[in-house]
Structures are given as C-alpha cells and as structure tokens.
C-alpha cells in the first residue's frame, strides 16, 4: 500500500515534467521558425537623408544569426563625409525571447549575478528591444538625454526577394531627424 502512495506522486511529477518539456520544445521550435528566414549576411548602400534634406552616402552590412535562446543582429555602417573622411561604426546585439510572443529583449551587458540584461537608459545608455511582425524584423533603440529629451531609432528589416528591405528612421523628441531606405542583398 505504501509503494502505491509513493509511485502515484512520482508518476504525476514525471507527467507534468514531460508535458513542460514538450511545451518548451514547442516554444523553441516556433521561435526558430520565426527567426530562420532572416538568418544570413546582407550588404548594400544608400544615401542617408537628414531633416534638412542633405544626403550622405553610406555602405551598410548586417548579419543575423540564431542563438540558443534568441538571435544576434550585428551591423556595420561606413559613412563617407564630404571632406573625404570615412567613419565606420559597428554594433552587435543579442536578443533573448520574452514572455511576449514576437517581442525580444536585448542582452547587452551582464549584471553582478552574470545574467544578461538590457542597458539602462537613465544612465545615458540605449534601451534596445526587437520584434518580429510578419515578414519584418524591427530593432528599436531608445536614448534619454541629460535634459530628459529622447531619441528613438527604428530599424525595419523586411524580407524581400534576394535580401532585405531596410528602412531606418531616427526621431528626436517626436520629430524625424534622419531616414534611409535601401535594399540589402543576401550574400
């Protein structure tokens, strides 16, 4: 009689544990199906348009890769200044799944416990997050200035035949200050 009382709780625990693993596996495979079409290396160039209408030529590349529990977006921009100077900037952000479907948090630094966490916009660092909506992977970056004003950058990367359509916008306190649209070819 005692063995039956022990076996039943163990059986129930194993059943709940197995169902939980199946649900987690389903969640991960759903995620993989969402990011997989975006995975790859892309290159292109465009003229960035400032709010005053001036244009600056820029080369761009982006690499999107799948991670164990999220994905990485790494991008490089090379700006050609009118005086002959060349400015290159590189960025790389890991994105982790969240409890919200299709919304991803940025893991840009580690806290004292070794966990990856977003940066703190109240310290002048960008708050970054991403989302997948249909055929578009969007990365947002929010900056809060010393006076409380803000800057929001939005990178929309939409799947297109042979690559990605890139649409970038920068808003300062609600006013669009810079934008670019171009095609990035898959390598």
Regions found by a protein language model. Name each.
Residues 1-2, 26-33:
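Basic/polar N-terminal segments that are highly enriched at the extreme N-terminus
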Residues 1-10:
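N-terminal secretory signal peptides that target proteins for export/translocation
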Residues 5, 16-18, 36:
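Generic extreme N-terminus detector
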Residues 13-26:
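Bacterial N-terminal signal peptides
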Residues 30-43, 66, 131:
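N-terminal helix-cap/turn-to-beta initiation motif at the start of protein domains
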Residues 45-52, 56-57, 69, 79-187:
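Calycin-type beta-barrel ligand-binding domains and close structural analogs
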Residues 58-62:
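Active-site-adjacent core segments of small-molecule enzymes
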Residues 73-75:
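Single-residue "anchor" positions within short linear motifs
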């Amino acid at each position: 009689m005692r063995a039956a009382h022990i076996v039943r709780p163990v059986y129930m625990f194993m059943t709940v544990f197995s169902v939980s693993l199946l649900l987690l596996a389903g969640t991960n495979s759903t995620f993989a199906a969402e990011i997989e079409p975006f995975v790859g290396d892309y290159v292109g160039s465009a003229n960035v348009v400032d709010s005053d209408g001036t244009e600056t030529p820029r080369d761009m590349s982006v690499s999107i890769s799948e991670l164990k529990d999220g994905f990485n977006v790494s991008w490089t921009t090379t700006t050609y200044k009118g005086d002959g100077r060349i400015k290159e900037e590189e960025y790389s952000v890991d994105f982790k799944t969240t409890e919200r479907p299709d919304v991803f948090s940025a893991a840009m630094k580690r806290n004292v416990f070794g966990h990856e966490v977003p940066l703190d916009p109240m310290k002048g660092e960008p708050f970054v997050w991403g989302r997948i909506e249909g055929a578009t992977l969007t990365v947002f970056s929010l900056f809060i200035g010393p006076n409380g004003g803000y800057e929001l950058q939005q990178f929309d990367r939409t799947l297109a035949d042979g690559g990605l359509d890139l649409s970038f916008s920068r808003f300062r306190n609600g006013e669009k200050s810079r934008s670019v649209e171009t095609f990035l070819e898959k390598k």
